[in-house]
Amino acid sequence: PIRQELRRLDNLGLLQSNEDWLMEDSVPVDELYDTETDPHELNNLAQEAEHLEIMELLKRNLFSWMVETKDLGLVPEYEMIEKSKGGAPYDTFSGNFDPKPILDLVDKIGRGKQHIDSFNFALQSSNPVYRYWGATGLAALGQNAVESKELLQSTLNDPVPYVRFAASEAICNIGYPRKGVEILSKGLDSESVVNQLHASQILMAVGKNAAFALPKMKIAIDNLYKIGADESQSYDKHRAWYTRENLEYLVSYLNGKENTNSN
């Protein structure tokens, strides 16, 4: 409901100047709020000089906690499911999972082109999680990642779906949307609802470029309704619902009749 209202107000041009950032395509890399004086977290203090010290302290504490607890938020969902094979992901990863080097890479995302070599290097790793974050870092650079075109094109053939999807977003962002959207469109055919959801999220991110996938999106929506009606598919129902919502919103948007009642 909150997102619906934000979209409605944004479409009407009624968001205030300190609120319109909520509808931006990306969020700030760092965020810090005074929740006592700003309970709705509208005034980001992260870049103000007087708050830099506390910002760095909180960041260090957060990263230390993520390393100590082996935070699996750094691992794509598909990877967790595949590796744990129905067991508890934490049990699967807790033994040899070291989040620190991944966290160091992730922290570079959104912080400028000076980190492009780190993303390119990660994209060539034998570890798909590194490749994923390398591609995600290049996607965040937009046109500034154009020098990585050949590397990204080869990554479109990566054996791991979530790596292909991240590379697809990056290739779209440097001006080659047809190739990227083709990969994402195929992702909607996946037998894994996790992959379908991820592909739909990236299609949302590439916006108007997703028009190449309109026919496939309409087919996917019909199939997702069937999953929602199948009582034996209870585990995937929520993912199917979110995927369908993404695609229905995107189809409406691409057809020029954005549905402001969509989540």
Segments (PLM) and residue ranges:
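Structured segments of extracytoplasmic/periplasmic soluble domains
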Residues: 48, 61-69, 209
